[in-house]
Design a protein with these regions (language model features):
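A glycine-rich phosphate-binding loop feature that marks nucleotide/adenosyl-phosphate handling sites
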Residues: 192-204, 314-319, 343-350, 412, ...
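N-terminal pre-triad scaffold of radical SAM enzymes
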Residues: 37-43, 58-61, 250-275, 301, ...
Length: 627
């Protein structure tokens, strides 16, 4: 066990990030289990502890008597300095065991700009970065999460990639690891990886060869062995009603980003917003019943003492039994001062009655996501809402006592013009004027938050070249010039960070050396604006003979091989191509939950179907797929 001396620990910011011992944390004797796993999140404690996936994995592994899971997060700059000064290796929170002593080190890949933190954590742990330099005496490096669907830029560092939902995969992997460990891993690491690759949803990068053309373009990724799959299909959990859910999560000692109980209403989203990678990755929609959700809420509140429950899914307002669920939750917790919160709401799903109910305990502002300022642009991205929808929702809200509205938009979308940007300002002014007309007061406020669009893999925009940073900055200045009212706040994201994010989102295996160069030059916590250094990143690319524009800004041909083609989210490329063509024509594609199947291919490929309780019972739809 690593000993932490309070004589120096008290001088770092928020020592509770590193002490462990939180309520509901689980401590096991490593000598009594067969498999030890460090669950890593490459960001600071407050961000990591807010992530539902970590909570699920922590409970999932620790419910087994033969396995132990502990947490490890990226130490903040001051703590890292102290650790390096005192030669303290990266350690787990539960038992302060050096990370290099675990059997498995499993990272959650949530955001491309956290990749340098992975390298920094490996260095602090004394673990070689490149998978080729590690034998079975080191922890096996495993990763999963949305970025795993193009893991190629960091594939050289990882041994195993879990694609899709991990509950069932995790048990299968631990069972195999336990059995092979007991036999002494006959045949060594490569033999073990070949066995792991037989688990559905598993990608082992070292078992594949990457080929490039003479011009330096990506050509192919092919397996080195006949028993290794050419493409890896994602895993899903069909029975979300009965799947494990963490009702006894660790309660942190300090405030975290999302410090509340979390209810996952359903998985997947079929709205089909064309900019949204998650909506494609996590199909099909699978709902939990209100009764199951109520029991989860009761157990979680009893086990944690939280006073807020957040209803979380990709589009929570689309939960088919939302009014019934809210009534059940409010009735259960009305005398316990436990509030219920909804994230940003789709305008067309908004019900003022629901909003009024969930804010009986604590009232806050309302958040909507029109995403674009004109109807043409909203149709291009398949948002499926109108200006009338937004103004109607705001009318109901203002009549019911709300004064504050936050609106989310994106900038840099395909086919976007200055007229579309002006529409953002117009909408903000219309909402503000609406508040004054309804209330007769001038105390209304509108927050306009605009992010820089980053094209992502496995979406209809995966072929689209990102707009130039200078053009984005011009657009940001232009929109700012149109907003001249102290009651309208305008926030926007840094364009340079989005540029690097796009490069790694659509990159290939050559980018691993860029990451190492950038890390060696001091890059880490790149998702934090105050620590992102654009010039250092440009130099890292140049030193490796690469250009970020090649990966981020280049529009790709439909028939061009893509570095992520072998990582199959089961939405067919034919469907994505059709959606791109529909976008160019500004044509809408309806939600298959409320209409006929659109042929995305997920349900027949996975032999599953949508699970929806809208009509009072379980609904499963027969579907087809575009090939």
């Amino acid at each position: 066990m690593i000993q932490l001396d309070t004589s120096w620990l008290q001088h770092v910011q928020k020592p509770a990030r590193y002490t462990g011992g939180e309520y509901n944390s689980i401590v096991k004797d490593h000598s009594t289990v067969d498999v030890t796993m460090a669950l890593a999140f490459p960001d600071v404690y407050e961000v990591a502890m807010s992530h539902l996936g970590i909570k699920i994995l922590y409970g999932l592994v620790n419910r087994r008597e033969d396995a132990a899971a502990e947490r490890v997060f990226a130490p903040w700059h001051d703590m890292e300095e102290e650790m390096r000064k005192r030669n303290i290796p990266l350690f787990s929170l539960e038992t302060r065991t050096p990370i290099k002593d675990f059997d498995v080190l499993a990272f959650t890949l949530q955001y491309e700009m956290s990749f340098t933190n992975i390298l920094n954590m490996l260095d602090l742990a004394g673990i070689p970065m490149y998978a080729k330099d590690r034998d079975m005496d080191f922890p096996l490096l495993v990763c999963g999460g949305p970025c795993a669907f193009n893991v190629e830029p960091i594939a050289d560092f990882f041994d195993i990639v879990s694609l899709g939902e991990s509950e069932e995969w995790g048990d299968e992997f631990i069972d195999l690891y336990k059995a092979e460990k007991a036999k002494g891993f006959p045949g060594g690491k490569e033999a073990f990886l070949r066995k792991v690759a037989q688990i559905p949803g598993t990608y082992c990068p070292a078992l594949y060869d990457v080929e490039y053309t003479e011009q330096g373009d990506f050509k192919s990724i092919t397996p080195r062995f006949e028993d290794v799959p050419a493409a890896v299909e994602k895993r899903i959990v069909e029975d979300v009603e009965n799947v494990f859910y963490p009702t006894k999560p660790v309660v942190p000692f300090l405030d975290i980003v999302h410090d509340r109980a979390v209810l996952e209403l359903f998985r997947g989203c079929t709205r089909g917003c064309r900019f949204c990678q998650a909506g494609m990755l996590y199909r099909p929609v699978r709902e939990k019943t209100p009764e199951r959700l109520l029991q989860i809420a009761k157990d979680t509140i009893a086990n944690t003492g939280y006073n807020e429950i957040s209803l979380m899914s990709l589009s929570s307002a689309d939960y088919s039994k939302l009014p019934e669920l809210v009534d059940m939750l409010m009735e259960e917790f009305k005398d316990k001062q436990v509030s219920v919160s909804l994230p940003s709401l789709r305008i067309d799903s908004f019900s003022i009655d629901i909003a009024k109910k969930v804010q009986q305990v604590r009232k806050s502002g309302l958040t909507f996501a029109p995403e674009a300022g004109t109807q043409r642009m909203r149709d291009v991205i398949n948002k499926g809402v109108s200006e009338e929808d937004l103004l109607a929702a705001c009318t109901n809200a203002f009549k019911s006592g709300w004064n504050t509205v936050k609106l989310y938009f994106m900038m840099g979308l395909p086919t976007e013009t200055d007229e579309d940007l002006a529409g953002i300002a117009d909408l903000a002014y219309k909402v503000l004027d609406l508040h004054r007309d309804i209330t007769g007061k001038r105390n209304g406020s509108v927050t306009v938050s605009v992010s820089f669009f980053v094209p992502k893999t496995h979406s209809p925009y995966q072929w689209y070249g990102q707009q130039d940073v200078e053009e984005i900055h011009r657009k940001q200045r232009y929109l700012k010039s149109l907003i001249n009212n102290r009651n309208i706040s305008y926030h926007y994201h840094d364009g340079y960070t989005g540029y690097m994010e796009a490069a790694f989102a659509r990159g290939d295996r050559r980018l691993s050396k860029v990451l190492v160069k950038a890390w060696e030059a001091g890059c880490k916590f790149d998702g934090w604006t105050e620590y992102f250094n654009y010039e250092t990143w440009l130099k890292a690319f140049a030193d490796c003979g690469l250009n970020p524009a090649y990966f981020a800004r280049r529009t790709r041909d439909f028939d061009e091989p893509l570095p992520w083609d072998h990582l199959d989210c089961t939405v067919s490329k034919a469907f994505l191509k059709r959606e791109w063509e529909q976008a160019v024509e500004a044509n809408l594609t309806s939600d298959c939950r409320r209409g006929p199947c659109k042929g995305c291919n997920v349900c027949p490929e996975l032999n599953t179907a949508i699970i929806d309780y809208k009509e009072g019972g379980r609904v499963e739809k027969v579907t087809f797929g575009l090939k």
